[in-house]
Amino acid sequence: MDTSFFPGNHWLFFSVDLLVFLVGLPLNVMALVVFVNKLRRRPVAVDLLLLNLTISDLLLLLFLPFRIVEAACGMKWILPFIFCPLSGFLFFTTIYLTSLFLMTVSIERFLSVAYPLWYKTRPRLAQAGLVSGICWFLASAHCSVIYVTEYWGNATYSQGTNGTCYLEFREDQLAILLPVRLEMAVVLFMVPLCITSYCYSRLVWILSQGASRRRRKRVMGLLVATLLIFFVCFGPYNMSHVVGYVRGESPTWRSYVLLLSTLNSCIDPLVFYFSSSKFQADFHQLLSRLIRACVPWTQEVSLELKVKNGEEPSKECPS
């Protein structure tokens, strides 16, 4: 990797990955709790799809510490090499799972509004489970190229190129990698983007004919969050695939726009939040419980500190 592209660039990677981990992990854990409880009470297809998206985000976040360690070490891979392709495989798989599941959610939302009677007569939950399995298969099958690339040409390869992990590539590796990246940009990004854009544009038009203001506002929030993920988080990264294929090389700036892709695990909870009013209510309820659980503990600690310092605890609230 060209370290002259950004002075001290590994600290940029370290800071962004650490921030995403600290913000995204608690948000997605809370979303996981909400969706599990919702599915236990009343299973709905869209909630099953969003649950899979949450699990995908959590996988990315749980393996993000590997990238944090890598960045702290100057973008050199010091961990056992077996974790290099594994962390890369899970990292990129979850990125493309996001685009696929956002597409399926948009289709589900569109069908429920455009064809409500037909929608209610279909076994949506079973279909959602099947679609989820297909999404996991498509994303993981495409991203398995990471294993092919890292071990290509030498079955006993014990370290990446120049001691890095999936950052620098030999010519024989690029010959395999670049065409697959182009296909991923088309199949796993551009196609989902087109389908998602169509579904939400139609959904907004239908709701503009007579839906309540609150429902229109929720759908617009869902639309903005979804398009933000596609265009800001995933757009520049997938454009690097097209540029790399045309130029016959892995662009130097690819790793930097990849940072934007990691932000999706922090933005996805916005999609969850605007997905339904029931999720908003359950999320607020869970958040209130957490706050109530933490506040007495902080008050108790504060009281103990006052006693230790010889101060008399206040019995009245200030007016």
UniProtKB/Swiss-Prot annotation:
Location in or out of the cell: Cell membrane
* Cell membrane keyword on record: yes
Q: Membrane spanning segments where?
A: 16-36, 44-64, 99-119, 128-148, 184-206, 219-239, 255-275
Task: Give each disulfide bond as a residue pair.
Answer: C84-C165
What spans does the record annotate as topological domain Cytoplasmic, numbered to this chain? 37-43, 120-127, 207-218, 276-319
The outcome of changing R41C is: No effect on activation by propionate
**GO (cellular component) term, any one:** membrane
Keywords recorded for this protein, A-Z: Cell membrane, Disulfide bond, G-protein coupled receptor, Immunity, Inflammatory response, Lipid-binding, Membrane, Receptor, Transducer, Transmembrane, Transmembrane helix
CDD domains membership: 7tmA_FFAR2_FFAR3 (cd15170)
- How does the protein associate with the membrane? Multi-pass membrane protein
The UniProt entry's GO biological process terms, in alphabetical order, are:
adenylate cyclase-inhibiting G protein-coupled receptor signaling pathway; cellular response to fatty acid; G protein-coupled receptor signaling pathway; glucose homeostasis; inflammatory response; mucosal immune response; negative regulation of blood pressure; negative regulation of insulin secretion
Q: Which family does it belong to?
A: Belongs to the G-protein coupled receptor 1 family.
Q: What does this protein do?
A: G protein-coupled receptor that is activated by a major product of dietary fiber digestion, the short chain fatty acids (SCFAs), and that plays a role in the regulation of whole-body energy homeostasis and in intestinal immunity. In omnivorous mammals, the short chain fatty acids acetate, propionate and butyrate are produced primarily by the gut microbiome that metabolizes dietary fibers. SCFAs serve as a source of energy but also act as signaling molecules. That G protein-coupled receptor is probably coupled to the pertussis toxin-sensitive, G(i/o)-alpha family of G proteins.
Name of the protein in its database record: Free fatty acid receptor 3
Per the record, the gene is Ffar3
